[in-house]
């Protein structure tokens, strides 16, 4: 069970939190029309200034900027965990597991596209350094079976080993995604139960439940907005967590026909009312 005498780490975490991008920052970023403008704002006005200090913002492209920002936030997390050896507590490996799942899914996408030889260019060494398997070997993968061979000694192997290709030789990335994310959600819950106790455990389980519940609300909206997906289609991409939205309202939400209808129904939920309280512009959206 975790020792709660991590006051120095708590103070450091609060410092990181204080440096986060605020609402005004996001409003300013939304006004930008090019990647160089976004990079320049981040360089001049946010805590990313140091990691962007040697970057020519006038010529930076989106992929490179994303990699720099992702690496910086990941390294901040690693430094925080190393500070008082939180990395020795299993729960704090959650971010590494999430990264591994993301990389595995991306590898399958490249296999489906027939461009697996290019996948090596997308693997970030800073992620590979903290992986539970030899992530750089994924650059040698050419087939799904090659991927399984590398994952054989990991929990991921048994989760995805029985997947079959369709008539075009492609693997169902959506189905694999939800299988791996289901594993991830359950892993986080079990780690919380194992490493925390009492009110802290209760609060952590509640917080993570809300986080995944909101992810479902957001992802369902995206599917509704961009593809007009129905409930049956959306149900396959949802995290397996109870919702704070009533069953009746949740069913109504998932069976809306448009993104506008979705927002109208969402306004009548606890999440929607909270969103309106935080941002009155939402009440006018539909």
Question: Where in this protein do the model-derived segments appear?
Answer:
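N-terminal domain-start signal
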Residues: 1-286
